[in-house]
């Protein structure tokens, strides 16, 4: 189960709330902050190396043999890679080709649209124009996945309840 969408749309908040609702699931936190801890530049400053590190993170998550709830997935990598100036064309081709091979590994996509302004936490981008472009790209990619996806809206608990209804 992959939680996807632009930054600052409530994914991590809902991810944390889902932990006590899905006790038999493994929870995998988002990758961007993880690779940033290794010193890779992130957000608009991301590079080919950043994106390949994030690719490794997402592919490793798919190797886990249990039910997963993911705060971001390979789709996020594809979307954000399309908006980076510092990424080589061959790396973007690799990411897109890999996406086409792994996208069916996800059983459920949960899409978080933009409903409120970005929160400046010192890590995520607060560039609203960039964020809106990212959101539109998510919508395009979601239309290309085989599985139907759920769009969640409202308060965090309303979103959790929508997910519970969708997953049962």
Each model region followed by its residue ranges:
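Hydrophobic positions on the alpha1 helix immediately C-terminal to the Walker A/P-loop
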Residues: 14
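P-loop (Walker A) phosphate-binding loop of NTP-binding proteins
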Residues: 6
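Conserved substrate/cofactor phosphate-moiety recognition/catalytic segment
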Residues: 19-60
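A glycine- and Lys/Arg-enriched "phosphate-lid" helix/loop adjacent to the NTP-binding pocket
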Residues: 85-158
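Hydrophobic anchor at the beta1->P-loop junction of P-loop NTPases
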Residues: 3
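Conserved lysine of the Walker
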Residues: 11
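Glycine-rich phosphate-binding loop used to anchor ATP phosphates in small-molecule kinases
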Residues: 52-103
């Amino acid at each position: 189960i992959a939680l996807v969408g632009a930054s600052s749309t409530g994914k991590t908040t809902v991810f944390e709330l889902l932990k006590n609702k899905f006790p038999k699931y493994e929870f995998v936190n988002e990758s961007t902050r993880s690779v940033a801890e290794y010193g890779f530049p992130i957000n608009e400053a991301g590079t080919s190396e950043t994106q390949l590190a994030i690719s490794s993170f997402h592919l490793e998550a798919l190797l886990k043999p249990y039910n997963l709830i993911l705060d971001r997935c390979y789709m996020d990598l594809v979307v954000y890679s399309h908006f980076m100036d510092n990424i080589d064309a061959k790396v973007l081709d690799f990411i897109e080709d890999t996406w086409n091979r792994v996208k069916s590994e996800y059983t459920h996509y949960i899409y978080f649209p933009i409903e409120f302004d970005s929160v400046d936490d010192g890590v995520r981008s607060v560039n609203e124009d960039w964020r809106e472009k990212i959101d539109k790209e998510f919508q395009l990619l979601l239309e290309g996945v085989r599985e139907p996806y759920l769009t969640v809206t409202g308060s965090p608990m309303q979103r959790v309840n929508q997910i519970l209804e969708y997953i049962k």
